Amino acid sequence: MSMEKPPLASGLARTRSEQLYETVAADIRSPHGSMDANGVPATAPAAVGGGGTLSRKSSRRLMGMSPGRSSGAGTHIRKSRSAQLKLELEEVSSGAALSRASSASLGLSFSFTGFAMPPEEISDSKPFSDDEMIPEDIEAGKKKPKFQAEPTLPIFLKFRDVTYKVVIKKLTSSVEKEILTGISGSVNPGEVLALMGPSGSGKTTLLSLLAGRISQSSTGGSVTYNDKPYSKYLKSKIGFVTQDDVLFPHLTVKETLTYAARLRLPKTLTREQKKQRALDVIQELGLERCQDTMIGGAFVRGVSGGERKRVSIGNEIIINPSLLLLDEPTSGLDSTTALRTILMLHDIAEAGKTVITTIHQPSSRLFHRFDKLILLGRGSLLYFGKSSEALDYFSSIGCSPLIAMNPAEFLLDLANGNINDISVPSELDDRVQVGNSGRETQTGKPSPAAVHEYLVEAYETRVAEQEKKKLLDPVPLDEEAKAKSTRLKRQWGTCWWEQYCILFCRGLKERRHEYFSWLRVTQVLSTAVILGLLWWQSDIRTPMGLQDQAGLLFFIAVFWGFFPVFTAIFAFPQERAMLNKERAADMYRLSAYFLARTTSDLPLDFILPSLFLLVVYFMTGLRISPYPFFLSMLTVFLCIIAAQGLGLAIGAILMDLKKATTLASVTVMTFMLAGGFFVKKVPVFISWIRYLSFNYHTYKLLLKVQYQDFAVSINGMRIDNGLTEVAALVVMIFGYRLLAYLSLRQMKIVT
Ligand SMILES: Nc1ncnc2c1ncn2[C@@H]1O[C@H](COP(=O)(O)OP(=O)(O)OP(=O)(O)O)[C@@H](O)[C@H]1O
């Protein structure tokens, strides 16, 4: 970046990415460094040893050279992979370094062993300490580091003149809103890019866009990954941590990460290896102490906010992503935990990953940890470059803090157009005096709009063009490596059946508390007992008794039609956020999820009605014989599954609980009224509605089971062979589910 002021001494130090370019270039040139179709080097990660043995002394010396890292007067000995990477820079010309580069160079290995932080900064550093992460014998070349994931493809991300517009529909018209305007920049493996800006400036939008989560039709400009456009293949190489932690509240930390590992890691790993990876991530993130604690949510006490955020990050780093994007990973965390999180991102970057994070208001300690910075204001670019040079740049355009200020606070004030305690450039002052009064606030200071306009213009005229030119430089990867990012094929972690099994078990675990909810059991059993008492040993030898018992059968049909609809409508709207997140990451096929979600509730759906029917059947004196008992039970099951189908369909179509409950109550009421008990003479033009009612078919089947031996018609209902009713219920079971599935397919993945 060209600036009027010379860059600070720290800015002269090469960034980690610049140093690492050389390593990757050496690696790619190296015969050992060629990658296979999966972006995996042809050689297995070389054992650390032989000529490449990392000596503690050299490691210490190299850490001293690391820009942006204070070594604490040599007391903080960093023994992480980053040190190993840096050592390679020194040794790159030697054969030993080249052979080791094939496994450990930029982007080709993933091992962020611990979270280095100067001890003077954080006292309680135990969970993040890397002191024990790489034992002595690793340095001696005997053992691999604790966490050694398979190598990945490095991703060089460039974006040029990115724009994003949305159309906001109003009652009579629609308005176009520009959310991002002409944003350009780049981030390389080994770097952490921070996106900063006031609330609503477009950080999340830009992050989603860079993650490939916004449809290209509404965006302008170009975003390239290794100089190639986005492809579905990249989904499995990109980790995206959303601002809100979307996790299942009733799963423990270990269960959450183990299921993520089993679903997302490639088929080439065994189940045991995947479990081990989850345990490694737990250790890396310092989550051992809470690994068996439930995540928790609004109604369940669980892990702390910081731990939950780390689980969210773990969910993404478990796949060993080449590009990791995080939306406000530090919001809501105390400053120490926030710093730990950012240090962790550094370690991830140092393992050769490209890291982008939005950040709201970092402390000055955090601010200095970022390699690059993008400052946004009202969707426009106010600064892109090294974060260490940001203050120099703004002072070069006449904006400097007048009092001692956290640099992040200063930048955010500027981006907000708030120039209290900030020196105003004379150019801006002149403009205000010459310009109209609207550009000036009552205090005589330029308005926020005028400040914004000045900053955008200053960046455009002084920096933007040179930065854009830099984007034209080809990335230091050979064509073969670049081509890997353009492969169109998605990569599923596991086969369909395994996805189904994992999702089924996960569903059972997440809802286990519902299955054994005493409230629900009490609700069903007390209803059964009340029915049993009201219809106690009912006598059907009189017409009145028969009529009474028919009423009981109708109530059973209504009760088991009503109950499942209202439980099932919650299924998809409640899991919408999770479904969105997991489908955006291509974790599983929708069909596997759908089937697992709809079948994992079945055990409960059979236990409770069975208990209910046992109580009611014998208390009320229905036909005591195994055959009618089991047929009645089967009829109730058919009714439950059909009713559930309707609930699932309504939930999936509307995806909104309020709307879904309203529609469900109207539908259920209509079906109940058309069920054949309350009204017998229905006008012809509306009589067809009964055929849609599962209550009607269930009632007819229950009547048949009880009275087929001595009656042809009961209560105006003809008793026939019952095949039509069974067929109608079966059609409903599949039809409603198909409708629900198709609606989910149509659902847009919102990011
Ligand atoms: N689909 C959309 N429809 C309408 N407005 C949108 C849409 N997406 C984003 N916006 C608007 O774009 C602006 C930027 O939103 P974005 O969420 O990217 O901001 P942000 O910088 O991440 O804010 P915060 O820090 O508060 O999360 C906001 O004003 C938001 O309301």
Swiss-Prot record:
Gene Ontology CC terms: membrane
SMART domains reported in the protein's UniProt record: AAA
Domain ABC transmembrane type-2, first and last residues per copy: 498-707
Keyword 4Fe-4S: no
Domain ABC transporter span(s) in chain numbering: 157-403
GO molecular function, one term: ATP hydrolysis activity
Record-linked PANTHER family: ABC TRANSPORTER G FAMILY MEMBER 22, ABC TRANSPORTER G FAMILY MEMBER 28
Family: Belongs to the ABC transporter superfamily. ABCG family. Eye pigment precursor importer (TC 3.A.1.204) subfamily.
Name assigned to this protein: ABC transporter G family member 22
Organism annotation: Arabidopsis thaliana
